């Protein structure tokens, strides 16, 4: 059986505090994973401040400008190579952690009108659409728009800017929506990046 292990690389020796960034707004899959990491760091007596960014591009710039110590990025991000290929950045850790349940959501207590329906989604879970809405390829009356996160998609539906969203269960609850179809959790792999420099290994 194939096995390998990797030690987490801190950006500085004897670290006691960390500023960690990932994709927002509140209740993204990335934030859920960051909250899991925070519990692990707190168990090691490390104080963590989290920052949520509108895009991973903004997160990368914040890391390069030393506004965060670490950047948490899912491998589903279509431009994750921007982090790997940045000469100033170093991979600190790779791990797996599941997302919340994903599904297709609408506003509660509202009948869905399919004619000229607008569906919003982050690009990463867009391939789930044929599973969530089996007749989608043949429905010409659905307009698809891309947004920066699953949480942003849920917010747009709540605000009446869209009719449907591919979103996660946390964002669904936060924005008082309901699923009309569920896919389940995604077994996601994640990378943590920091700027190159002196690194401490546990």
Swiss-Prot record:
GO molecular function (one): lyase activity
- Report keywords, A-Z: Lyase
- Enzyme class, top EC level, equals lyase
Report which reactions are catalysed by this protein.
prephenate + H(+) = 3-[(4R)-4-hydroxycyclohexa-1,5-dien-1-yl]-2-oxopropanoate + CO2
When this gene is knocked out, what is seen?
Cells lacking this gene are unable to produce aeruginoside 126A and B.
Q: Does the keyword Cytoplasm apply?
A: no
For this protein, the Enzyme Commission number is 4.1.1.100
Described purpose of this protein according to its UniProt entry: In vivo, involved in the biosynthesis of 2-carboxy-6-hydroxyoctahydroindole (Choi) present in the nonribosomal glycopeptides aeruginoside 126A and B. AerD is an unusual prephenate decarboxylase that avoids the typical aromatization of the cyclohexadienol ring of prephenate.
Which protein family is it in? Belongs to the prephenate decarboxylase family.
State what protein this is by name. Prephenate decarboxylase
Organism the protein comes from: Planktothrix agardhii (strain NIVA-CYA 126/8)
Q: What is the lineage of its organism?
A: Bacteria, Bacillati, Cyanobacteriota, Cyanophyceae, Oscillatoriophycideae
């Amino acid at each position: 059986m194939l096995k390998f292990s990797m030690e987490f690389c801190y950006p500085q020796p004897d670290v006691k505090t960390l500023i960690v960034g990932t994709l927002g707004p509140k209740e993204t899959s990335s934030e859920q994973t960051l909250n899991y990491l925070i519990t692990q760091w707190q168990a090691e007596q490390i104080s963590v401040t989290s920052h949520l960014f509108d895009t991973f591009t903004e997160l990368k710039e914040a890391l390069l400008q030393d506004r965060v110590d670490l950047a948490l990025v899912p491998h589903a991000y279509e431009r994750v190579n921007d982090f790997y290929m940045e000469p100033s950045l170093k991979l600190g850790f790779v791990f797996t952690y599941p997302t919340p349940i994903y599904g297709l959501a609408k506003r509660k207590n509202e009948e869905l009108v399919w004619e000229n329906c607008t569906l919003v989604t982050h690009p990463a879970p867009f391939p789930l659409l044929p599973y969530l809405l089996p007749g989608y390829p043949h429905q010409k009356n659905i307009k698809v728009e891309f947004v920066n996160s699953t949480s942003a998609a849920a917010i747009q539906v709540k605000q009446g800017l869209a009719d449907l969203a591919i979103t996660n269960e946390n964002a669904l609850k936060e924005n008082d929506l309901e699923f009309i179809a569920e896919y389940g959790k995604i077994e996601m792999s994640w990378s943590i990046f920091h700027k190159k420099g002196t690194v401490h290994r546990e």
